[in-house]
Amino acid sequence: MTSLGSQLHRATFLTALLLLLLLQVKGVKTLIVSASLDGDKSQKDKVSSEDQGEEEYEEHFEASSEGEQWQEIDMVQQEDTISQAITLQDHLLDLAFCFNLASIMFFL
């Protein structure tokens, strides 16, 4: 086989492998997200509408009576920042893994 033919086969194999890895990673993340959404729905079904109203009122009352309302807002912002950082880290790790695999295939 010529070097050009070998390079074409290597490039085709690498492309197919990268596509499979990307699809697998996206599929796993989709399954995790859908499973967590299903769990949230079942938990919401368990709590009746009257209980929800009482819980919201109690949480608001406790937060305002103890002066923790600003702390709750900060906690929500902190959770958003943490989740964004985790998402970015996941994407970077996936990208690094794909580049490492590509470099291994290139030097084979």
UniProtKB/Swiss-Prot annotation:
Cellular component GO terms, alphabetical: extracellular region
Signal sequence interval, chain numbering: 1-30
Lineage: Eukaryota, Metazoa, Chordata, Craniata, Vertebrata
Region (Disordered): 39-64
Function comment: Sperm protein required for fusion of sperm with the egg membrane during fertilization.
PANTHER family named among the record's database cross-references: LLLL AND CFNLAS MOTIF-CONTAINING PROTEIN 1 (PTHR37348), SPERM-EGG FUSION PROTEIN LLCFC1 (PTHR37348:SF1)
Coiled-coil stretches noted in the UniProt entry, renumbered to this chain: none
Organism the protein comes from: Mus musculus
Protein localization: Secreted
Known tissue expression: Detected in testicular germ cells and spermatozoa (at protein level). Abundantly expressed in testis.
UniProt xrefs under InterPro entries: LLCFC1
Gene Ontology BP term (one): fusion of sperm to egg plasma membrane involved in single fertilization
Protein name per its UniProtKB record: Sperm-egg fusion protein LLCFC1
Phenotypic consequence of gene deletion: Male infertility. Sperm are morphologically normal, exhibit normal motility and can penetrate the zona pellucida but are unable to fuse with the egg membrane. No effect on amount or localization of sperm-egg fusion protein IZUMO1.
Record key words, sorted: Fertilization, Secreted, Signal
One Pfam family of this chain: LLCFC1
Gene that encodes the chain: Llcfc1
Ranges of biased composition (kind: Basic and acidic residues): 39-49
